[in-house]
């Protein structure tokens, strides 16, 4: 069962502002994660002190999200250096 993907406004803004190829690559990985939670298993890490926040890498970009049973909420998409601010 594919989960519904919801984007926080900051994450949606970041995806719109980046170049098209990178945005497409990140959206593809998010889609894979929504389809199959174990698809990116070796690339997903729980954030310390993040109250259920998880992250995965796409090149030098980090996608921070919460994983609920039916909804995958994308909270932040940012370059590696500023993703954890």
Regions found by a protein language model. Give the residues of each.
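A short, surface-exposed loop/turn module that caps and links secondary-structure elements
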Residues: 31-56
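Enriched for short, Lys/Arg-rich terminal
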Residues: 1-13, 17-24, 28, 54-62, ...
């Amino acid at each position: 069962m594919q989960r519904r993907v919801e984007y926080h406004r900051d994450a949606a803004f970041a995806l719109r502002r980046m170049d098209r190829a990178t945005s497409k690559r990140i959206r593809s990985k998010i889609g894979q994660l929504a389809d199959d939670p174990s698809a990116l298993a070796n690339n997903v890490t729980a954030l310390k002190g993040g109250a259920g926040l998880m992250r995965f890498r796409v090149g030098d970009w980090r996608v921070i999200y919460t994983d609920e049973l039916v909804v995958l909420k994308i909270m932040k998409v940012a370059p590696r250096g500023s993703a954890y601010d």
